[in-house]
A protein has these predicted regions:
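Short secondary-structure junctions and interdomain/linker hinges
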Residues: 63, 121, 154-157, 174
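Hydrophobic alpha-helical transmembrane segments
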Residues: 60-65, 145-152
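Generic amphipathic alpha-helical segments used as scaffolds and interaction surfaces in large
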Residues: 40-43, 128, 150, 207, ...
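Membrane-embedded alpha-helical segments and adjacent helix-loop junctions characteristic
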Residues: 123, 143, 160-163, 171-235
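C-terminal ends of transmembrane helices
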Residues: 85-94, 146-151, 226, 231
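Membrane-interface loop-to-helix entry segments
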Residues: 99-106, 130, 134-137, 147-172
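Conserved, well-structured core domains of diverse proteins
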Residues: 1-130, 136-140
């Protein structure tokens, strides 16, 4: 059987499937098919406004940079906020409206960056990066939000891998851990303070590269794709 005949057979089999089955197959392989299709203009306007702010923010900090921790926190927080509005909790959820708890997650995502912006001076100068109870609460909340946002977009694999590495520092001092993999005992402040209050954890070099280069590259590509310049570039 030739390759063209195989393609015809696959196409014929696909046409025999119901719309629901076709949508299920598309959703499995196409991430964009999982997003919500808003029935009202209000939520669509809010999402568009946040996306425009997100783009303008990255252009602004290119010329007027903020402290690395703050700009990376905003980058992650607004990205998460958009995920909670655009991606449903699970595939069978109603995709024409945003659930109340998704609005709550949206606000908490923004709060994760807002706290670092408001408390930045106290964190860096007054406390020298040593976390207090409120810091730890916001750190744990931010980690949970990131894991949930990753699950909605990519599935369970990445969040589970992240959880394994997150749990490891809490158990790495026990005697049943192989000697070469043992570490000293860490507490919540050590782990979540490092992850949330410094640029070696959640807001590390990878996020820095996303803020400074990757997002701008994608933004420029999206601009070209939606403008007439794309047709000229193909000439």
């Amino acid at each position: 059987m030739t390759k063209k005949e195989q393609e015809r057979n696959i196409l014929a089999e696909t046409e025999m499937l119901s719309e629901e089955q076709q949508a299920e197959i598309l959703e499995k392989f196409d991430t964009e098919s999982k997003v919500r299709k808003f029935s009202g203009k209000r939520v669509a306007f809010i999402v568009a406004a946040i996306a425009i702010f997100y783009s303008l923010f990255h252009l602004y900090i290119t010329f007027y940079p903020m402290p690395a921790l703050q700009q990376r926190a905003v980058h992650v927080a607004v990205g998460m906020a958009l995920v909670f509005l655009i991606y449903p909790t699970y595939s069978s959820q109603n995709r024409t409206r945003v659930a109340i708890y998704d609005w709550l997650l949206f606000l908490l995502a923004l709060a994760s960056a807002g706290y670092l912006i408001v408390e930045y001076t106290n964190i860096v100068t007054t406390r020298g990066g040593i976390p207090n109870t409120l810091d730890i609460v916001f750190a744990i909340m931010t980690v949970i939000l990131i894991l949930e946002a990753a699950r909605r977009v990519t599935g369970w694999i990445l969040p589970v891998l992240a959880l394994i590495f997150l749990v490891y520092p809490f158990i790495s001092h026990y005697s049943w851990i192989p000697r070469k993999m043992m570490t000293r005992q860490y507490d919540l402040g050590d782990i979540f303070g490092q992850m949330y209050l410094k640029t070696e954890g959640l807001y590390s070099t990878a996020i820095g590269a996303s803020v400074s280069f990757i997002f701008l590259f994608i933004l420029f590509g999206a601009f070209l794709a939606k403008s007439e310049w794309a047709s000229y570039s193909m000439i």
